Amino acid sequence: MAKGKVIAFITVITLAFGVSAIDNAVAAERIAGRNVKHNVKWEQIEIGDEEGHVIAVYENKGISSRTDGETSLLWECGILDMNLKTGVGSGNGYGTTTDKAGDKMYWTWEGKNVGKGTWEGTWAYTTGTGKFAGIKGKGTFTSYAAAPQQSYSDWEGELELP
C-alpha cells in the first residue's frame, strides 16, 4: 500500500512539473521584415574553369525593418561561389542586427541564386546579447539586386526568447 502511495505521489509531482514547464514555455513569435543593404566590400578570385566563375567575399551594411515596426542596424558578410555571367551560384555567411539599445542578434545564412540577381535561402539565429541573450529562431529569405552595390531581402521566420 505504501508503494502505491509513493507511485501516486511521484505521478502527481511529475504531472505538476510538466504542467508548470508547459506554462513557462515561450512560444515562438512569427516575424517578418525587409533588410536594405549597401555593399561596402567585395573581393573576388577568378576560378578559371569557365568564364565568369568566381569565389567572392563581401561585406554589406544597412537597415533591418520588421513588419511590427522594429528597426535595427544590419551588418552582413559572406562567401559566394558563383558564375557572374550566368548568375548561377551558392553562398553562406553571417550577420548581426543591432537594436537602438545596442543589443545584438547574430545569425547565419545559406542560399543559392535562383535567377540573375535573385537569391533564396535560409537563416538561423546563433546567439545574442542583452535582451537577445539565448535567442533561438530560423526562417527563409529572398534577396534581390536593386542597383549596383544595392540589394534588399524580404524574410520571415520565428523568434524565441527565453
In which residue ranges do the predicted regions lie?
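Bacterial N-terminal signal peptides that target proteins for export
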Residues: 1-10
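Bacterial N-terminal signal peptides
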Residues: 10-20
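Beta-strand-enriched cores of mature, soluble protein domains
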Residues: 24-162
